[in-house]
Amino acid sequence: MHTMKKWLKISIEANPLMVEVVSDYLVGIHGAGVDLAADKDENPAGQIVAFIEQAELSTADAEKCATQISVFLAEMAAVFNVASPSLVWEFLEEEDWSKNWKEHFVPFTIVPGLIIAPTWENYEAQGDELVIEMDPGMAFGTGHHATTSLSLSYLQDVVTQRGAKTVLDVGCGTGILVMGAVLFGAERGLGIDNCPDAVAAASNNVVHNHLAEKIDIGITPLSELREEYDLVVANIIHDVLASMVLELYSRVKKEGHLILSGLLADQQVDSIIEIFAREGFVLLEKGIEGEWGAVLLQKR
C-alpha cells in the first residue's frame, strides 16, 4: 500500500524586501519547497507559501516549527526595519500533491553557462553547460534570486577571467556559490555557516553534485580561519558584512577579490563600498538587480 505524503503548509505575508531572505531560510534550514503566490510586482504583500514534508502530522511538532520560523521572521523584520510578517500553518495529506508541485520547478539558467536543475529532473547538459542539481529553494522558490545570480556572475568573472584558484564562501547556506565557483574552474573551495542545518544541507548538495573532493563545508567561525584565499564571497546582509570587515580583509590574499551581496540598492551598496574602502579594498564593479545589489572589490 502506498503511503500518502504528509506536509506542513506555512503561509507568510511579509514585506517584499524580506521575500528572498525568508525563502532562502525556509529552504536551507527547513528543507522546504517554496512558492510565491504571485509575482512580486503584482503582490506587494510579499506572500510566501512553504511546504515542509513531515514524518507524522504532529500538532506539537508543527507549532515548534512555526515558532522557530516566527522568531526568524521577527529578527529579519528588525534588520530590515519593517513590520513583522504574519504566519499561518495547516496540514496537507495528498498523494499526488507533491508531483503536481514539482511541475512548477524546471531547469533554468541562473547565469550564462550554469544551469540549476531539480534533483528529480535528470537534466542532461547541452554542450559546455555546467549543472548544479538542487531541490527547490535557493534558486527555484522565488525565481528572483538577484543576490545569488549577481554573486555567481562575479564568481564566474573572477574564476574564469582573473584566475582565482581558492574560494571561501562565508555564510554558504545551501552551498550554491562555492559549488558554482568550483564548476567555473576553482581548484578548491570552503563553505562556512554558523547554522548546523545549513551546513548539513550544503554538505549533502556538495556530495550529490560529486564535488566533495574539491569542496569542504564546515561550521568553523570566520574568526578562526587562518588561510588566505584568492576569492572570498559573502552573500549575507549589510550590517553583518559591515561587522565582519576586518575578518574578511584578513582572509583575502593581497590583490585577491571579495564579492559582497545581500545588499539593498542603492544606499546599502554605497555604504558597504565606503566601509570596505577604508580598510583597503578598491571597487571594481557594482551590480544592481531590482531591489538588490552586489559589489566586486579587490584588496590592495
From Swiss-Prot:
Entry's Gene Ontology BP terms: methylation
A UniProt-annotated Pfam family: PrmA
Major localisation: cytoplasm
Localization of this protein: Cytoplasm
Record GO terms (molecular function): protein-lysine N-methyltransferase activity
Broad enzyme group: transferase
One GO CC term, this protein: cytoplasm
Reaction catalysed by this enzyme: L-lysyl-[protein] + 3 S-adenosyl-L-methionine = N(6),N(6),N(6)-trimethyl-L-lysyl-[protein] + 3 S-adenosyl-L-homocysteine + 3 H(+)
Keyword Ubl conjugation carried by entry: no
Annotated InterPro entries: Ribosomal_L11_MeTrfase_PrmA, Ribosomal_PrmA_MeTrfase, SAM-dependent_MTases_sf
Keywords: Cytoplasm, Methyltransferase, S-adenosyl-L-methionine, Transferase
EC number(s) recorded for this UniProt protein: 2.1.1.-
Binding site for S-adenosyl-L-methionine: 148, 171, 193, 235
Cysteine disulfide partners in this protein: none
The keyword S-adenosyl-L-methionine belongs to this UniProt entry's keyword annotation: yes
Domain of life: Bacteria
Family stated for the protein in its record: Belongs to the methyltransferase superfamily. PrmA family.
Function as written in the Swiss-Prot or TrEMBL entry: Methylates ribosomal protein L11.
PANTHER family: ELECTRON TRANSFER FLAVOPROTEIN BETA SUBUNIT LYSINE METHYLTRANSFERASE (PTHR43648:SF1)
Name of the molecule in the record: Ribosomal protein L11 methyltransferase
